[in-house]
Amino acid sequence: MKLKKILMESNVWDRKFGEKLPTLADVQRKFEQKKLNEATRWSVGIEDPNGKVTSVYGHYDGYPEYVGKLLKKHFSNPSLVKQLIKLGKSGISTLGKKIGKKHDFDMPYDEKEKLGYTTFYGRDRGEGGNFTQVSKDRTQIKTNSGEEFLYIWSVKDKKWYYKDEDWPNKRWEEL
């Protein structure tokens, strides 16, 4: 049953009667294509004065024009960043203008936008696990989930920085 679910989620289950099942490689390839088209993944972290970075995963709309803009405008405060990371330990689905209250994960996007709430996989969908990453410094941050953009609040500088992972040699830039 688990295999069927994976095949359905990867859009390879839709086949005509009598057709061969796809290979594992076919399923993985299709899943990766879907994953890349589905979301602009990102991570958000806080850098302490010694350079240590604590970060969590974010799933949708990770572009600087959206997540970057929201972080700079609404989360330029270390206590808010810490709260975002604490609640985001199981991941952040969508970033809003504020942390907001617990709400139905499947609430229509327009309603979430109107309320300005951030949607968390743990708080709002009940997912467990702790995917918080602690890195010695910025250079040690790992992108294990296909994150395209990394965002860090520097406690020392009191500024947001970001990096586009599609350009590995690119330096961190101020938002």
Predicted regions and their residues:
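Charge-dense, intrinsically disordered terminal/linker segments
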Residues: 1-39, 49-50, 101-102, 136-139, ...
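Short, flexible beta-strand-to-coil junctions
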Residues: 46-51, 59-62, 144-145, 153-157
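His-enriched metal-coordination microenvironments in redox/metal-binding proteins
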Residues: 35-43, 59-65
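A short local loop/turn or secondary-structure capping micro-motif enriched for an aromatic residue
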Residues: 62-66, 169-172
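Catalytic phosphate/metal-binding cores of nucleic-acid and nucleotide-processing enzymes, i.e., regions
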Residues: 46, 55, 63-66, 80-81
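Low-complexity intrinsically disordered segments
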Residues: 74-175
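Cysteine protease-like catalytic core of ubiquitin/ubiquitin-like
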Residues: 66-72
